[in-house]
Amino acid sequence: MKNKFLLFTFVASICTTNMIAGNISDTIVPTKHNKQFTIGELAEIQPGLGSIMREFGHRFYIAYYAAKANNWDLAKYQINEILEAQEIVEVTRPKYAKQLKSFENSSIKKLQNSIEKKDWKLFKQKYNETTNACNACHTVNGHPYIKYQLPKKEPKYLRMSL
């Protein structure tokens, strides 16, 4: 995630430098793989909100079962990764930035607090509140048919307990 942010910062600085020169979307950005992209090409391949929300949901799911298994470090890691993904959305989909920041302040921070306290009962309560906030946000944004629900079993590919 941080590499994506650094790339975005690099691209933004090139854009600022080249604004005077002409069409920004034609500015070429080199990669570490000896490939070159134009700013326009990079803009076209940015993930949509649905792709990032899928990551949100998956990490949210892992956080629940990690906390349930008292693996508070894994739960904390997953929530922090959600926030990093949120930063990408705030940059690439700025119309959602205010709403996401509000969600972070009203829900995610309370969830993080329950993780810091290592309090399963509090975590479960805040997790359910956060789930309700997610589903309400989907409705407000015209997607009432998207309802997150916690899978009944923990992921088999990742050990939850320490």
Q: Language-model segments: what does each one mean?
A:
Residues 67-71, 115-122:
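Short helix-adjacent coil turns
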Residues 85-102:
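Short, solvent-exposed, charged loop/turn and helix-capping segments
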